[in-house]
Swiss-Prot record:
Domain of life: Archaea
Keyword Secreted: no
Repeat is among the record's keywords: no
Protein name: Small ribosomal subunit protein uS19
Family in the record: Belongs to the universal ribosomal protein uS19 family.
Functional note: Protein S19 forms a complex with S13 that binds strongly to the 16S ribosomal RNA.
Record GO biological process: ribosomal small subunit assembly; translation
GO molecular function: rRNA binding; structural constituent of ribosome
Keywords tagged on the record: Ribonucleoprotein, Ribosomal protein, RNA-binding, rRNA-binding
NCBIfam families the record matches: PRK04038.1, uS19_arch
GO cellular component, one term: cytosolic small ribosomal subunit
Xref: InterPro entries: Ribosomal_uS19 (IPR002222), Ribosomal_uS19_CS (IPR020934), Ribosomal_uS19_euk/arc (IPR005713), Ribosomal_uS19_SF (IPR023575)
Xref: Pfam families: Ribosomal_S19
Length: 144
């Protein structure tokens, strides 16, 4: 018996639900599908900053559907603790990491994660060669 590829297997599903089904759910229904930390965050209610971000997302979605926008603009935000919801899929959100805004293209696989997970706040330090004026410990390195 030959293995048969089915297009349904390629479709994105979150806990057995398609993206279209997720878009029809309200936040309370959606929260039941999320892990405990995200579920608790959503069921406690959104902060004013999170509500403002969600309003911007919905406004841009509405303008895209009406045809007033050709492509979605980048939304800049400091809200790193916002759970990525299905209505954000397809948008680019620039998340502040403490120094700059990192653009994050939202794809379906990101649903249920936090925005801050995709904008790292620290980098791995790569020190230069030891030598004069490199670090305080270079005082003990003999000069040439």
């Amino acid at each position: 018996m030959a293995f048969e590829m089915r297009p349904e297997w390629k479709k994105f599903r979150y806990r057995g639900r398609t993206l279209e089904e997720l878009l029809k759910m309200d936040i309370e229904e959606l929260a039941r599908l999320f892990p405990a930390r995200q579920r608790r965050s959503l069921l406690r209610g959104l902060t004013p900053a999170q509500q403002k971000l969600l309003l911007k997302v919905r406004k841009i979605r509405r303008r895209l559907e009406e045809g007033r926008l050709k492509r979605p603009p980048v939304i800049r935000t400091h809200v790193r603790d916002m759970v990525i919801l299905p209505e954000m899929v397809g948008l680019t959100i620039a998340v502040y990491n403490g120094k700059e805004f990192i653009p994050v293209k939202i794809v379906p696989e990101m649903i249920g994660h936090y925005l801050g997970e995709f904008s790292p706040t620290t980098r791995i330090v790569q020190h230069g060669e030891p030598g004069l004026k490199a670090t305080r410990s270079s005082l003990h390195v003999a000069s040439k």
